[in-house]
Regions:
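Active-site-proximal catalytic alpha-helix in oxidoreductases
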Residues: 181-226
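NAD(P)-dependent Rossmann-like dehydrogenase/reductase catalytic/cofactor-binding core
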Residues: 219, 226, 230-328
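NAD(P)+-binding Rossmann beta1-loop-alpha1 motif at the extreme N-terminus of oxidoreductases
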Residues: 1-51
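Conserved beta-strand termini and adjacent loop/short-helix elements that scaffold enzyme active sites
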Residues: 29-31, 46-48, 61-63, 125-127, ...
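Rossmann-like NAD(P)(H) cofactor-binding subdomain of soluble oxidoreductases
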Residues: 52-139
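Helix-loop-beta segment of a Rossmann-like dinucleotide-binding subdomain
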Residues: 138-148, 200-210, 263-274
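Hydrophobic anchor at the start of a short beta-strand
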Residues: 3, 25-26, 97, 122, ...
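Rossmann-fold dinucleotide-binding core
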Residues: 105-189
Length: 328
């Protein structure tokens, strides 16, 4: 099967590796010096926890032409970069697209593609891995990499059997995890990571400086957001998040605090925040807009606002001239 991974950051490279290992003909869309490295050395990934290095000889392109047909396209880009590539995806003849990664405007992205090409199948995904990119390799952090994948909402528009089978064939059936409501999943993921993002910004991307009390506050902030979601009728996804809210996320603070104190916290959180602050603030802005639209909700965001205010203040201090997103 011909698979294109559109975007060659850490997640895109790890996803391309999975597709390659599944026996597909894999192409990576990359640009600049990194594209040169991929052509010269292949896709080199250091799997940190597994203490092994893999090299995959993938194809490399620098742009996607309308006539370049692939059985599956995975778009793996920062949320702020996705809108610019939607016209290219809509104009391309490939029949299936999966948008992978943070996306608080998933519905609008899908609609733009379908307005231009109603026959195209669109799904959404989130890839469970992290890491950073060095000059000639990727350092990846994962236990058992999974692509959480599905439609925005299966109740209104389920994923077709053909689309699901193609995704599973692309990455390997064992690496796919079905999700029936990716819109809710992505919204829940955003509010689970934003408090961590705020702590990263407040402590200059050094999570080892985070106190145990702040760790507990981060979880409490997520619970505040979850309560609003529940009242708005937004499902808490994935499975287990309803129970986590009912238990006030008890039992999670200590393991999370331990992660903050190790290199794992840097690879799964700090690195991404430092490399993509624009995407993090875009997530923040999207959530603040969602909060503002929930006019009848009167629940507390005391802890959330405390963490966010500290992050805004420190980021503004470190970046003179920066303006905080709407809602500050």
């Amino acid at each position: 099967m011909r698979v294109l991974v559109f975007g060659a950051g850490v997640i895109g490279c790890e996803l391309a590796h999975l597709c390659y290992q599944a026996g597909n003909s894999v192409t990576l869309l990359a640009r600049g010096a990194w594209a040169d490295v991929l052509e010269r050395r292949g896709l080199v990934i250091r799997h940190a926890l597994q203490m092994r290095t893999t090299t995959d000889r993938v194809h490399v392109i620098r742009q996607l032409s309308p006539e370049n047909r692939y059985d599956m396209i995975f778009v793996v880009m920062q949320q702020t970069q996705v809108p610019a590539v939607l016209p290219t995806l809509a104009a391309n003849v490939s029949p299936r697209v999966v948008l992978v990664g943070n996306n608080m405007q998933a519905s609008a992205c899908e609609q733009e593609i379908l307005d231009a090409c109603p026959s195209k199948e669109v799904a959404f995904g989130f890839f469970m891995a992290a890491g950073h990119r060095e000059s000639e390799r990727v350092v990846s952090m994962h236990l058992n990499p999974k692509l959480i994948c599905g439609p925005l909402d299966a109740k209104t528009k389920p994923l077709s059997d053909a689309m699901r089978e193609r995704v599973a064939s692309a990455i390997g059936a064992k690496s796919m995890q079905d999700e029936h409501s990716m819109d809710a999943y992505l919204k829940c993921h955003a509010v689970s990571v934003l408090p961590i993002v705020y702590l990263c910004f407040a402590h200059d991307y050094d999570l080892t400086k985070v106190s145990f009390g702040e760790t507990r506050e981060g979880l409490a902030a997520t619970c505040e957001a979850y309560r609003m979601y529940r009242e708005l009728g937004i499902a808490l996804r994935p499975d287990g998040e309803d129970e986590a809210l009912d238990n006030e996320c008890k039992g999670l603070a200590l393991p999370m605090f331990a992660v903050y104190k190790t290199f794992v916290g840097r690879l799964v959180a700090s690195d991404h925040c430092s490399n993509a602050p624009g995407e993090m603030w875009a997530l923040d802005e999207a959530f603040e807009q969602l909060r503002a639209s929930a006019e009848g909700y009167t629940g507390s965001f005391e802890v959330w606002d405390k963490l966010r205010s500290a992050a805004v203040a420190r980021f503004a201090e470190a970046h003179p001239g920066w303006k905080a997103p709407t809602g500050s």
